[in-house]
Amino acid sequence: MKNEPLTLRHRIGLEIARKLNNDLLKEHPLKQLFWECTLRCNLHCRHCGSDCKKIAGHPDMPKEDFLKVLDSVAASTDPHKVFVIITGGEPLMREDLEECGKAIYDKGFPWGMVTNGLYMTRERFRRLLASGLHTATVSLDGFAADHNWMRGNPQSFERAVEAIKMMAEEPGFVFDVVTCVNKHS
């Protein structure tokens, strides 16, 4: 077999294949890490596919177990570039949420949470901020009657709105509101 120079067409094809292959091999940086810290929830939302309830069939994930995961992430990634999002169930069901948040923050990870706001009080919000809370997402699924129907609790709209107001009053605090659009909203 004779070594003939590759044609321009073949060289271009090989270069394209090499670049595509290199792109496939590049590591995609981790940007967000979700921690479902509990399966317990204080509401019974009609749209939720979770089997969360006030008393879960499984215990909450121990904080130490999640911190080990963060240690392994920090070994290969800059923690300041990975945002930890605490979800559930309802994260505010955890009595040690502030302790968990502080431990996450102390490891260099910014963190936020997704909440229905039912258990958010001014004092709890202050403690969460002191624990390094960067952001929060609050669920609000329509006006009072629709939201309360969707969430299965007559106080859920009022408490969610109060949580949103607290967050809006905090200078520089970043939060958002998510809505599950349905035929009642």
PLM regions with names:
Residues 58-61, 65, 151-159:
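Alpha-helix N-cap and loop-to-helix initiation/capping positions
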Residues 91-93, 117-122, 138-154, 183-184:
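Conserved radical SAM core fold
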Residues 163-185:
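Conserved strand-turn element in the central/C-terminal portion of the radical SAM core barrel
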Residues 81-85, 140, 176-179:
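Short beta-strands and strand-loop turn motifs
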Residues 2-135:
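Conserved alpha-helical substructure of the radical SAM core
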Residues 38, 148, 161-164:
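Residues within alpha-helical segments
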Residues 72, 103, 159-167:
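Short, conserved SAM-binding segment of the class I
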